[in-house]
Amino acid sequence: GFVKRLTAAALERTRHDVRYDGAYQSIPYPGGDVPSGVGVCTDVLVRSYRALGIDLQREVHEDMAASFSVYPRRWGLSAPVPNIDHRRVPNLEVFFARHGERLPVTDDPADYVPGDLVSWMVGPLPHLGIVVPVRSSDGARFQVVHNIGRGPELEDMLFDYPVVGHFRYYGPGDAQR
């Protein structure tokens, strides 16, 4: 099913050597990506979904073009920018809530299942990862694939930072598969 393919794509990302770099870059649209050797937390999700044929760059840009006012205004922009919008955690949080499912934020590990998307605040910085079907060493929770600066990695870090968002997104026309 979808979740199995998405989490396999996320786990596959951990085999890539990626230098953490969120610098603005001009990229093609649609289907654009920064060079494969660089990336940030959002690129783990963008590349995982793209492996399933879902272009978050296009999906986010089209939604922002249609509903720009519902997206955060943190960057002083007056219109969507397809080079960077899909690489910003706050934009993805809005997109996933609008086109997927926003789930309750809890401190119960049983509420976070493979395929779920989780956002945290790491100090003042937003962060995003994907829950995968690999249990923590104590079996208490699923682990997360994310990139917090060391490249894409599998880590038992679900509750290491304050959880601020919890989502599911199964692609365009998400039918809560």
Where are these regions (language model features)?
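Intrinsically disordered, low-complexity N-terminal regions enriched in serine/proline/glycine
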Residues: R19, A23, S48, D111, ...
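A structural signal for short, hydrophobic beta-strand segments that form beta-sheets
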Residues: L56-Q57, V131, P162-G165
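N-terminal capping segments
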Residues: G1-F95, E101
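Low-complexity, Gly/Ser/Thr/Pro-rich intrinsically disordered linker/tail segments
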Residues: G139-R177
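Acidic helix/loop microenvironments that form the catalytic cleft of cell-wall polysaccharide enzymes
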Residues: V38, W120, I148-R150
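A generic structural signal for short, solvent-exposed coil/turn residues
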Residues: S48, M121-G123, S136, L158-Y161
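...with weaker cross-activation on analogous glycine-rich loops/strands in unrelated enzymes
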Residues: A65-V145
